[in-house]
Amino acid sequence: MRRVVYLVGLAIGMCMLSSCAAISRGDAPPDDMKSPDAALVYGYVEADNDNIVQVDFLQYNRLYVSPFKAPPRVLVFDDGVFMAENIKPGNYVIAGFRSERNNYNLSRSKRQSYQHIFRIKPGDMHYLGSYNLHVTQTGKIEYGDFKVTELERPGEREVLMRLYDATEGTAWQDKIARRLKELRQ
């Protein structure tokens, strides 16, 4: 009897873990727009011989203590496109990227974080850019063991076209369509 209870608990735990992994990989659908002041932050990231699964997107000068306060959710899709929806206005920073094998920490101190702050305004659509992470020294990845290069492609338009399909049925899709129209002109 105890073994059955143990196996059922193990099965439930595995299901919960797999659902968390799906959310971090962008398999979960984006949430609908919660208010007109909510912002959308998006971009693209790739790593040489590595698959980025998480973007550490944090509000600057905010302490996140699990389970009470969590950082904004960032969906990372298999093609490297990422998005964070329903972002409140404020100052934010990309603290790093995580892959299945490595952590790419972009800032190790408050001073380094301060140099990369960007401001989100109410109702903003903020494109962070497209980046490549190149490991310069093999072994344990620490700050300085990799190089971040800005890419020309995919550009904002290509990233938004991918997100247009991913946000089907939400108010974000209309907002993305308007931004795509602006970029065509």
Indicate where each model-derived feature is located.
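Beta-strand-rich interaction surfaces with strong enrichment in secreted/lumenal proteins
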Residues: 71-73, 83, 115-119
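Bacterial N-terminal signal peptides that target proteins for export
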Residues: 1-8
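Short Pro-Gly-centered beta-turn/loop motif in secreted/extracellular proteins
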Residues: 78-91, 97-101
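Short, solvent-exposed coil/turn segments
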Residues: 77-80, 111-113
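Primarily secretory-pathway and cell-envelope proteins
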Residues: 20-66, 102-185
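Bacterial N-terminal signal peptides
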Residues: 8-18
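Short, acidic Ser/Thr/Gly-rich low-complexity loop/linker segments typical of extracellular
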Residues: 68-78
